[in-house]
Amino acid sequence: MRPTPARCSGCSSGYWRSFDSGLAVGSWQLAENDLVGGGSGMTRSGFVALAGRPNAGKSTLVNAIVGGKVAIVSDKPQTTRREIRGIATGDDWQLVLVDLPGVQRPRDPLTERMQGQVERSLADADAVLLVLGGDQRVGPGDRFIARAIRNVGLPAATVLNKVDLLDEGRTLAGLAAAADLGMEGEVFPVSARRGTGVPELVEHLVRLLPEGPFLYPPDERSDLPERVRLAELIREQTLLRTREEVPHSVEVEIDELEERDDGSLLVHARIWAETESQKGILIGAGGRMVKAIGTAARRELDREAGRRVHLDLTVRVRKGWRRDEGLLDRLGID
């Protein structure tokens, strides 16, 4: 007999009414009596790995739980190439959410490294969250990931994400399909984009954590190095403005960070492409594309750095960079 969830959190009729207003991302708070320690002084902390197919909405979910942007988001596969840790802290708990690259079959050294990150993070986690995209049918990829999670034997839960795109009937069908994956634990219908269902999910994840002290300062939201954070924000704007093979074929590297006398920051960055034709697309007619990428990226960099940022952005070609082990090391994709 297959295991079934103890319950489907939030599946009452009141849950559907909650979509009328929705919750702003990061606006939720757990009541004191919902916290595991209940004000007793006991704390819980640990790592929760988020696993799922590409485009399941893992990064959006991490941002919703943390209450701010720590992982870039786009509708392109391979948006997440590095292990991203988002940190959410309450009065007596701390969740370290590990946003893993989407599980896929490795095709080159880049994707081999991405899948290696998945395997290592699952082995080191305290709990695992399987994230399913409600806009995708449950398929072989989801079953493969569910088996991998069962094999590590950690406390687990399942999220059916993007339920704001579904009516009640399709959501209930998705929850049933999630239960058929044989995962232990609860299934949570969630809209990470709107924040609906996030408080119930957080409360449950906290209860899966071991007792222990906080792993990071309470005000820290991510442990990514500054250069990587800035490069990711530039890459996000590149992904949002390109199509077809270009998003898969670009990476961003920060060459230099230069402190200016007026307190602003000058960022020297380059976009790596694999072919001259991709470089032409990224530059655009009269330089319009790279200018648009740079303008949008500067706004994000200003917010991230908390000060004025100047961006010197160039586009370069490095054929076969996804197979260049030295460059992958330098980019921090390990």
Question: What would you call each of these model-derived segments?
Answer:
Residues 4-37:
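Amphipathic alpha-helical dimerization/coiled-coil segments
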Residues 38-116, 120-124:
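Conserved G1/Walker A P-loop phosphate-binding module
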Residues 57, 197, 289:
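Conserved glycine(s) of the Walker
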Residues 68, 87-91, 106, 121-128, ...:
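Conserved, well-folded catalytic cores of nucleic-acid-processing
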Residues 92, 116-186:
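Conserved C-terminal guanine-recognition region of P-loop GTPase G domains, centered on the G4
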Residues 99, 161, 191:
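Active-site glycine-centered loops adjacent to acidic/histidine catalytic or metal-binding residues
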Residues 155, 164-222:
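Canonical P-loop GTPase G-domain recognition
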Residues 226-334:
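P-loop NTP-binding site
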